[in-house]
Amino acid sequence: TVILAERHDIPVVQMDYQFAGGYSADPAGKPGIANFTAGLLDEGAGERDALSFKSRSEELGARIGAGAWLDSNGATLSALKKNLAPSVALFADMLRKPRFDQNEIDRVKGQWIAGIKQEKVQPSGVAMRVLPALMFGAGHPYGNPLSGTGTEAAISALTRDDLVGFHQRMMQPKGATLIVVGDTTLKELVP
């Protein structure tokens, strides 16, 4: 499904690509996989490693990212009209051909686990980690931490195959919605 709101007063296009799922769809024993997988999408895609991907995005003046929420996964692109085609190509690579390079997985795991440790010492973080299990019960899809970060043990145990598999199951065009707002037309988006 494509939803388009044409706004031609500013030469910018914003895209929001939403997939069903989110961290309520994390498989048993893998809390955090939805958000972690989404967080790695812009760490290299297609022929570009993480540094090359980010450099190209900056050259184009595009902001590209991805994340997961309770009931959805999503990716966003904000691009200048004059650089829309190459920005969309980079965005498409991120969505269709994420690299999941092991060195990036390891680097992001370290950052992620540090973030989980931070959550555990902040009152709001503790609440986001503890309340869902108390309200819905451990094992319920909504019983995982509301931050979507999972647990240290689960994140440490994730493999590249886990991430590739999750991406192939949950982050595909079938059933997805693309919302586009900005200085473009449907003909430009779907030639």
Placement of each model-derived feature along the sequence:
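Peptidyl-prolyl cis-trans isomerase
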Residues: K97-F100, I105, L158-R160
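M16 family metallopeptidases and their MPP-like homologs
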Residues: I3-A5, D9-D42, R48-R96, K109, ...
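Non-catalytic, conformational "gating/processing" segments within enzyme and secreted inhibitor domains
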Residues: S124, R160-P191
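Short, intrinsically disordered, charge-balanced linker/junction segments flanking boundaries
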Residues: T1, G29, E188-P191
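Short, surface-exposed beta-strand/loop micro-motifs that present aromatic residues
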Residues: T1-E6, G165-R169
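Short amphipathic beta-strand starts and helix->beta connectors
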Residues: S57-R63, A157-F166
